[in-house]
UniProtKB/Swiss-Prot annotation:
Record-linked InterPro entries: Kunitz_BPTI, Kunitz_BPTI_sf, Prtase_inh_Kunz-CS, TFPI/VKTCI-like
CDD domains: Kunitz_SCI-I-like (cd22634)
PROSITE patterns listed in its UniProt record: BPTI_KUNITZ_1, BPTI_KUNITZ_2
Disulfide bond sites: 6-62, 21-45, 37-58
Positions of the BPTI/Kunitz inhibitor domain: 6-62
Keyword field: Disulfide bond, Protease inhibitor, Serine protease inhibitor
Keyword Disulfide bond: yes
Any GO MF annotation of the entry: serine-type endopeptidase inhibitor activity
Transmembrane residue ranges: none
Protein name per UniProt: Male accessory gland serine protease inhibitor
Site features described as Reactive bond for trypsin, chain residue numbers: 22-23
Function: Serine protease inhibitor. This peptide can inhibit, in-vivo, acrosin and, to a lower level, plasma kallikrein. It probably plays a role in Drosophila reproduction.
Length: 63
């Protein structure tokens, strides 16, 4: 991986459906299986470093 955070699991926030808190932050995460950045909604809790503010930022860090 270009950077370690890109190898972390898809960034979610602790809930099976991906949203466990009341925040609504459109975000991007690198999906190592698909080898591409994908969009998701971050709820504001938990998660990991595989979370980026834009597709461009994700691609610059991970692709």
């Amino acid at each position: 991986f270009k950077n370690p955070e890109c190898g972390e699991p898809h960034s979610l926030d602790g809930s099976p459906n991906g949203i466990s808190c009341r925040g609504y932050f459109p975000s991007w995460s690198y999906n190592p299986d698909a080898q591409q950045c994908v969009s998701f909604v971050y709820g504001g809790c938990g998660g990991n470093n595989n979370r980026f503010g834009s597709q461009n930022e994700c691609e610059e860090r991970c692709i």
